Regions:
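Exposed boundary/loop context
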Residues: 9-10, 39
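C-terminal motif of bacterial Sec signal peptides marking the signal peptidase cleavage site
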Residues: 14-16
């Protein structure tokens, strides 16, 4: 009985450690904890109405297919870097230091220069800090489910 209790405790402890890792990506040697937006409602809401985001956090938008993308900052209160990646998770376009916008539907679009399937939003200045160049690889952690 004591051995079974000990085994159950260890299993629970290990399960807690695995989930504590969270959902992460790596870019430019830096790990970021990310929220995933992989359906229309989540992609539409994005980072709206947030007053701040920890420096090591971001949001990863996953689209069903690679195609030209365009994002805007409607109701977004924090400046962001918007980074576009193709299906191979290579950086194909960057919109750096995009300012917040409170103009509602009057906010300008920020398009990708090439077809993209993944879009990563980080705090403004991160792309410059990492010295990102097109072709940089986005690595995804095991918690990121990528549909085929």
């Amino acid at each position: 009985m004591r051995l079974a209790t000990c085994f159950c405790f260890i299993a629970l402890l290990l399960n807690g450690c695995a989930s504590a890792g969270g959902t992460w990506i790596e870019l430019g040697g830096q790990r970021y904890m990310v929220e995933i937006a992989d359906d229309d409602a989540e992609r539409q809401r994005g980072l709206m109405f947030r007053d701040a985001m920890p420096i090591d956090h971001g949001m990863l938008f996953i689209h069903d297919r690679e195609e030209p993308q365009s994002y805007w900052m409607k109701n977004t209160r924090i400046a962001l870097d918007i980074l576009y990646f193709d299906s191979a998770r290579k950086l194909v376009a960057q919109q750096r230091d995009v300012p917040p916008c409170s103009l509602g539907d009057g906010c300008p679009p920020y398009p990708s220069d090439a077809p993209a399937r993944f879009v990563l939003e980080l705090n403004a200045g991160e792309a410059a800090r990492l010295k990102l160049q097109d072709g940089a690889e986005l690595r995804v952690g095991p918690g990121v489910a990528i549909p085929r």
